[in-house]
């Protein structure tokens, strides 16, 4: 494994987690060492780069090869202890020296192609983001000097398969992975990078002309929208646990309608004013159900049963048995009220709707008729 010059771990929930480096750092290092091999005409087995964040990486080189004025080298991606679809794959650079004075950068096998607006790259270009483009070109220019030129191709033979485990297809990046990384370093389980990837999907939807968006916690919500609402899932964006953040991003981007769709296990937290729904931040599901059941006049016996439940599903069984299923419409209205309270200082707040569904894809409740909401979404 490559030696890192940033050994200090990141601590999460009492665990020491190892940092890693981005595909952008891999591509930069591969391009730099390939160019150096052309110039020196001998194989190099280790290369160092300075990342945009100022961290020095000393990385092992794999599959080095020289043929005249062209060289190929690979760096193995190491995501550290982060959950990363590209971890362990090889990122290659093929560099050909010329006398043009210009550096050209292209994406080859396994590097995605941009097919939609909104990711900050021209349509049809390789999915190599701006910061990696700059670091690759700077590293090559430093090696070859001001007069020479070079053609640089970044490729990743496993890229197309690995990309199926990423958000790329939803972002309109097809055929492979993206070469990304603004700092060059992967921070284990970085919440900010996760939120940013979700927000990017919102930006792409807005750039495509959509003005109404459906925010769901995960894949189950998207399936419900498709099967039970009959609405094009192009309008669906995953918000994960970051409800407040994604609502604020939707407002920033100018969406006129936000529809929150999900299972009560996630969405009822919003009725209590909880806008980060991960259980390690806040729970209060049973407390919220008990409070609103009490407001609807539920008997003490039901309140006690629900309060003692460990799961929302178990609580829902008691609610159904006692005939209080109308609580879900009440909760949906409360969710919308809480969202509007959060956005009370927004100059032009969007319309907010909420739909709750069961694990077997049945509608439990909504703030207004679901057919009415679906019709507006299809406009």
Swiss-Prot record:
Which GO annotations describe the biological process of this protein? anaerobic cobalamin biosynthetic process; methylation
Task: Write down the top EC class of this protein.
Answer: transferase
- Report the EC number(s), separated by commas if there are several: 2.1.1.195
Which InterPro entries does this chain map to? CbiD (IPR002748), CbiD_sf (IPR036074)
**Keywords of this protein's UniProt record, alphabetized?**
Cobalamin biosynthesis, Methyltransferase, S-adenosyl-L-methionine, Transferase
Which Gene3D superfamilies does this UniProt record tie to the protein? CbiD-like (3.30.2110.10)
Family, according to the entry, reads as follows: Belongs to the CbiD family.
Name the record gives this protein? Cobalt-precorrin-5B C(1)-methyltransferase
Origin organism is Salmonella typhi
> Taxonomic classification, please?
Bacteria, Pseudomonadati, Pseudomonadota, Gammaproteobacteria, Enterobacterales
Q: Gene encoding this polypeptide?
A: cbiD
